[in-house]
Amino acid sequence: LDRPFSTLSGGEQTRALLAGLFLDEGAYPMIDEPTNHLDGPGRALVSEYLRNLGRGFLLVSHDRAFLDGCVDHILALNHTGPELVRGTFSSWFRDKEDRDRGELARNEKLKGEIRRLEQAAKRTSGWSDKAEKTKHATRNSGLRPDRGFIGHKSAKMMQRAKNIERRQQSAIQEKAGLLKDIERADSLKLTPLACHSGRLLEARGLAAAYPGAEGRPVGFTLNQGERLCLDGGNGSGKTSLLRLILGEDIPHTGTLFRASGLEISYVPQKADHLQGKPVDWAEKLDIGLTKFLTILRKLDFSRELFSRNMAEYSAGQRKKILLAASLCQSAHLYLWDEPLNYIDLFSRMQIEELLLQYRPTLLFVEHDRVFQERIATQVVRL
């Protein structure tokens, strides 16, 4: 309690801010992403507090388990517009998936009908052109056609064809207007490197040391293709352990084995240091610009953002810059420190599917319980 606020960990700062918010019992709580940096027990505590608050509140969060524990309404800001429904996050998402499946099926049917109408319109246009050509009879036939009769007949045929074509185009536009803009996330790709050694890391009694204190010693082995979650309370030294693995000179006890020639891709917890445009960051890290920008587009970046200074980005956009850069790197080991802080729901799901599909060797810190349960092949608790 005597330490300056700036020296606290991200989760400890979040706890202090929430405590200050809840002290004012007369105010209407408006809470913006309270789970960022907050550990598992802290999230459970805040969720329970809100559930039993006895009055209304407005909450922004992308943590699925947290939302299920404390809300009874969902206001979803979808691409097609806002949607307010009664229920938990899980009930809303199940209904959304059911609706999306139905809309996808209807979209495919409509696209088939549009293709058939376009083909029919093309044939009709051909008839119209053919009718126009009959006005100009060939001179090689040896006959002298009645141009007045043929002109009248072809004009009627052409007018009929044009009317049919207009009706077909109107039907095409009507069908196209029925197509639904369904919220879908593009799949991401990753190219992890295979390590010559099956064992990438091994820690024995490893703990970061602090002035007057020492973290809890941990032991683990991380093999090729495994995904290890470091779990622990705020301030327990998880980030310090990641920095040790990166090779930083941090006072510690115990031993750490790292496979020789280990290539590591690192996503730090904070992204406040980002400056310049995305192209500048790509050049600094020596990663392919086209691939980098493509990944950002798949993570819902607009092209307009590429010309802006990253210092002007939201916290979630800056975090996506770090994640996209990591996904551009081929590495033996991916080291991610709270990668989901400030990240929206659909991007979280994209990242989960990516990790399950490409199975990189990953050591991560993340308090999102759903992400932990889906991704971690082992959990080490501090």
What label would you give each PLM region?
Residues 1-11, 95-211:
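Coupling and communication elements adjacent to P-loop NTPase active sites across diverse families
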Residues 1-108, 191, 195-382:
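ABC ATP-binding cassette signature C-motif
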